[in-house]
Amino acid sequence: MNRLDFVDQASLRDDIPAFSPGDTINVYVKVIEGAKERIQVFKGVVIRRQGGGIRETFTVRKESYGVGVERTFPVHSPNIDHIEVVTRGDVRRAKLYYLRELRGKKAKIKEKR
């Protein structure tokens, strides 16, 4: 194992739940405003998961006041307090970019049974 792999291994988090594209999750993000630190919840559908190891990222999409908002998070970021899986989605794709054009009921994802 070379030095970079050793450093990467030490930085990996082990408290991340298993989730995949199509799942609805709550991401609890640490927000620092001046000297204060608070936790902000970002709830949405995972539309992609990309990369591996320390460089792994995922993108969450939500509708906020009729406007689509997407946010990409590193999986092993120290700015993420914790992740909570709300529902498991039943999808047939790994990347759900088609949800960007859909609105309302058409953007609904079936729940896994």
From Swiss-Prot:
Entry-linked InterPro entries: Ribosomal_bL19 (IPR001857), Ribosomal_bL19_CS (IPR018257), Ribosomal_bL19_sf (IPR038657), Translation_prot_SH3-like_sf (IPR008991)
Keywords: Ribonucleoprotein, Ribosomal protein
A biological process from GO: translation
Keyword Ribosomal protein: yes
A Pfam family the protein falls into: Ribosomal_L19
An annotated GO cellular component: cytosolic large ribosomal subunit
Gene3D superfamilies for the chain: 2.30.30.790
Alphabetized GO MF terms: structural constituent of ribosome
Family label: Belongs to the bacterial ribosomal protein bL19 family.
Role summary: This protein is located at the 30S-50S ribosomal subunit interface and may play a role in the structure and function of the aminoacyl-tRNA binding site.
HAMAP family named among the record's database cross-references: Ribosomal_bL19 (MF_00402)
Name of the featured protein: Large ribosomal subunit protein bL19
Organism per entry: Mycobacterium ulcerans (strain Agy99)
